[in-house]
UniProtKB/Swiss-Prot annotation:
GO molecular function, one term: tRNA pseudouridine(13) synthase activity
GO CC annotation: cytosol
Cysteines joined through disulfide linkages: none
UniProtKB keywords: Isomerase, tRNA processing
Stated name of the protein: tRNA pseudouridine synthase D
Amino acid sequence: MTELELLGPRASGEPLGTAILKAVAEDFQVDEVLDIPLSGQGEHLWLWVEKRDLNTEEAARRLARAAGVPVRSISYAGLKDRQALTRQWFSLHLPGKADPDLSRAEDASLRVLKQVRHQRKLQRGAHSANGFTLRLTALAADHQAVDARLEQLRQQGVPNYFGTQRFGHGGGNVHDALDWAARKALPEQRNVRSRLLSAGRSYLFNQLLAARVADGSWARAQVGDLLAFTDSRSFFPAGEAECADPRLAILDLHPTGPMWGEGASPAGGAPAQLENAIGARQPALCQWLAQAGMDHERRILRLPIGGLTWHYPEPDILQLEFVLPAGCFATVVVREVVDLVSAGQTDSPCVF
């Protein structure tokens, strides 16, 4: 499957040129934003860890081995890409135990930058955002055009697609999800099951978002839409008054799309008709997600880009810095500016 099939059309026009992302790990830096004050005491040891070319799950295994605890005793908020320089939190459950010597886990690919005790473990999804520093190299695009496009994105946001990382190489995770759905079965391995359910659900969401990008309604509220604030998981229906809410114009409030699961969509009007039409294309997949116990949830269609700045360290290098809500993909910002030329394997099954 192509990127266009997995995601959908761009909202800002054709790409302005080409560039390479992730030529080296330092070209893709991610800093987890966690708004939790740590108490300094408790049976959980929280670790601020820097990883280079190392995925989150392998880092967790190494930390657990060094601490002498089972891997189930370590927690993290979210998965980070392997081919990157990332900094994120982990927590170790150490009831009645002293702080372990973690030096055996450290090498050029992993460093423990900080250790703090706390009463609770780190929950999955606890981080509020991720900060990104991206260096696009071998840039072949007009700087003035790039500047204008980035200013446009700063003001209007981008479609909140799930990135290709979610779907595996060539959309393999989607193919596998469709195959399991057709057989009305689930993989026995928990991590495989989770990965394929996530891929199938994300694919359906992207199909819905692609249709709204195509008709120009992705950033505009319609009567019957369900609206949500950027950092909220709650939503409310849009009538005519809500469609004129000034918070839509300043990118605080957004229309949402369905994350398919058990239960009917609460949307109404034209948005509900479109959601039903998208679901009708893949009835087996929708039923599979519901039978797997996935709840119907919502995801904002428009992704606001926080604190977007950029400069050119060299004529053929563009450096971008910005913040995105947790669960959103930096690559969907980049694709609205340039086409990415591969400098090796840049996709991974991880989500930021």
